Amino acid sequence: MSEQDARSVTGIRDKDYNLIWFVEASLSNALRLEGYISDADMDGDAELADFFRRAQAVSRKGGDLGKAMLAARLKKEE
């Protein structure tokens, strides 16, 4: 949803909406990948488990970077 769309629905422009969404999506993806890793491990598929672990690390990094950026932006507003 674009800022214009969100504004027309809620009447409020949220400049941080996309960043908050990104953090939530990244960390949710990292959590979801935990199940995929477990499944691959149980199936004895080390290659797939390793692939999911690498993808999970990237998702966590994105979440961490997004959290840091959001914290810095919110602190500026104080």
Spans of model-derived segments:
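Iron-associated oxidoreductase/ferritin-like identity signal
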Residues: M1-E78
